[in-house]
Amino acid sequence: MPALSVPSGARSRRALRGLAAATALAVVPALGVATTATAQQGHRSTISQSSHDRQLAPRTHFTMQADGSSGLTAGGEGIPNIDSVKKTIATYYGDPGTGIADKASSPYISEMAATLEDQKTYLKTAYNHAVRQGEKPALVFDADDTTLWTYDMEVADMHFNFDPARQDVWVQEQRFPATPGMVSFVNTAAAMGFTVFGLTGRNDNQKAATVANLAKVGYTAFPEDRFYTKWTGVGSSQQPAYITCAAAKCTTVEYKAGTRKHIEDLGYDIVLNVGDQWSDLQGGYADRILKLPNPTYYLPSPDLPGLSEPRLAPRTHFTMKPDGSSGLTVSGEAIPNIDSVKKTIATYYGDPGTGISNKSASPYISEMSALVEKQQKRVVQACATGARQGTKPAIVLDADDTTLWTYDMEVADMHFNFNPAEQDVWVKDERFPATPSMVGLADAAATAGCTIVGLTGRNDNQREATLGNLAKVGYTGFTEANYYTKWTGVGSSQQPAYITCAAAKCTTIEYKSQTRRHVESAAGGGYDIVANFGDQFSDLKGGYADHAVKLPNPTYYLP
């Protein structure tokens, strides 16, 4: 869907009235289990890459409410993975991975150009109509990601974690480039005869720098007396008399709609109101609105009391490939907004906003409990059967988010931006709690006759601490001999002879699948891997297990 442009009603002085609409919330089923082909003679647990690995892939269709509430019902696989969302956003903005948007060519720039081109005919018609009616036609523009482009700040500097102190540095130093296509659009409209107003959530202390930044990048139509910023409550910067709010603190919609009403009370007709957030556009007092694409943050606000505008809301259905390539073809509105994804993940883990998951009750814990209960019966039966038949049954368990739970590190500490040095601190300090229900599964498998094998992407220097952490939280079946960590390439920690890779650096699948093959070989113990558990599809691909069990994890993606 392209950027949205809709009429705001028969007359801009009337607040918008939308049609009531009910949006059905899709409940995504809990995770399934990928089951391998029957063991073949000579390769007891080897699976067919072509037939089975194709099933081991992330979901591509999602239903997500913007407020995060889908985390209550969607299941972990039904939540857009945040790493895939980041890659999709980067692709859309032409960001090669540096956090810097391409300023010359990108899907975002192309969409902006097409969106603004579509408005030109409307502006000419609307201007001529207003003049014939003896009105003073005006346009209203938001600042951030409407006239000034914040991507480089949001991503390269803040890594999708907004910091008001850092933002103020960018504002005061006037660092922002113009939003693509907007300088020409605004200046052309001003030359046509429109009066141009700015209306932003930036505060009064940032007004002078913002107006200067706009002029610096080429805008000619934003004088300070037509540029509205929000009061700070300090000194002379107080709430204007023309704005009244239902509570002591005004909502964004109350502030912006009230300011637009004030502009119209001055005798102007707001022909078009342009913003990148729905809260820029709600509340009426404009003949038409234009929603610009922005999946990099979400600033919701309650609408005006008694006003319903169901059309002015984010989309809820998304198609997204895990590798980020969807950013080449979908519109900005069709990319899951990263702030909504974060809220959905937080809801799923019972995180109240602190970055700390609920350790007692959450949708994640419930899903893990149901999944493990189902799989434990299958695993215990396979272990018992193998033990009776003398086939040396074993289960393989990944570490992070399979046996040890990393959410608090990933969110409270790293804010969804992985830091290997900080991760090493958590590992060496043995800080991780157990992944819900997994201690019981491992114990039941061991009691039924299975050997417990650990296989992780953590390195050899982290093996001792990882085994210590596992024992600390209640696991009893892991041993040094059957716990596989990745080589560092330093000293005696070298690539094992039983692993060969297509390139100098092994992929996760090469490392893990060939380690499982080794475990099933005579040299590795001659085990029959009856089940392989992991939270990443790369933990499971490549065969050498009778069953592969994918655990939910929307907090990172390791292809």
Task: Give residue ranges: language-model regions.
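Non-catalytic pre-domain segments flanking phosphatase-related domains
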Residues: 2-141, 305-397
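C-terminal cap/substrate-recognition subdomain and adjoining C-terminal extension
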Residues: 42-54, 106, 205-343, 363, ...
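Soluble non-cytosolic domains of exported or imported proteins
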Residues: 79, 83, 102, 106-117, ...
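Structured segments of extracytoplasmic/periplasmic soluble domains
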Residues: 118, 122-129, 150, 154, ...
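Surface-exposed patches in mature extracellular/periplasmic domains of secreted proteins
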Residues: 127-138, 194-202, 224-226, 271-273, ...
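Asp-based phosphoryl-transfer active-site loop
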Residues: 137-150, 198, 393-406, 454
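A solvent-exposed, charged loop/short amphipathic helix patch at secondary-structure junctions
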Residues: 155-173, 411-429
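Short, acidic loop-to-helix structural element flanking the phosphoryl-transfer center
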Residues: 167-197, 206, 210, 423-453, ...
